[in-house]
């Protein structure tokens, strides 16, 4: 079972808030799925506890599924600090606020507002490209340098076409990331 039930000791009323600190350790497995490492990337997604959604049907207590889109979560704001070895480039949810480095490590400070999840992927092999289109910073993280420029053009064209058809992209950044991921793709 992957559901943690916590007894609060008192009823939490509508719009009332509380804080809960959970300390835990995460060991990243050798896996080319959503969470794990492969030959080229370290995929750190779905890696922290989230609250079950309480909607008009009550608490949604569905467990994690390995196939399909098994996630149902509220949106949140994230303020994350990550300390990683300098050899890696990082693709992440949200906007980079600050970065500091020494000879061995890099400290990233990242914010993401009104998103359903916070994910990041590390690789020492990324070829990173950045362009801007319609006020959106477009980032591509490629494992094949020969295809890197084309991947960036396709990402830019996607933002332009979808913005015309469906309305302005609601975030300031859009990233496309190549990874060791057996399913073929995932949106975060």
Residue map of PLM features:
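A surface-exposed beta-strand-loop module
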Residues: 1-40
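Short structured motifs
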Residues: 3-8, 62-67, 92-97
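Glycine/proline-rich low-complexity spacer/linker segments in large multi-domain proteins
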Residues: 24-78, 129
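Hydrophobic helix-coil surface modules that form long, contiguous segments used
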Residues: 54-55, 69-188
């Amino acid at each position: 079972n992957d559901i943690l039930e916590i007894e609060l000791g008192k009823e939490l009323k509508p719009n009332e808030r509380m804080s809960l600190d959970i300390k835990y350790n995460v060991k990243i497995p050798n896996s080319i799925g959503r969470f794990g490492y492969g030959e080229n990337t370290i995929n750190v997604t779905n890696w922290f506890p989230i609250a079950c959604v309480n909607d008009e049907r009550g608490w949604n207590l569905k467990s994690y599924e390995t196939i399909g889109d098994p996630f149902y979560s509220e949106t949140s704001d994230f303020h994350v600090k990550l300390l990683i070895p300098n050899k890696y480039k990082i693709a992440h949810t949200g906007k980079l606020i600050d970065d500091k480095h020494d000879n061995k490590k890099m400290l990233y400070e990242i914010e993401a507002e009104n998103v359903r999840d916070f994910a990041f992927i590390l690789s020492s092999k990324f070829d990173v490209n950045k362009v801007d289109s319609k006020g959106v910073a477009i980032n591509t993280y490629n494992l094949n340098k020969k295809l890197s420029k084309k991947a960036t053009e396709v990402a830019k064209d996607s933002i332009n076409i979808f913005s015309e058809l469906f309305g302005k992209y609601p975030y300031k950044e859009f990233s496309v990331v190549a990874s060791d991921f057996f399913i073929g793709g995932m949106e975060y």
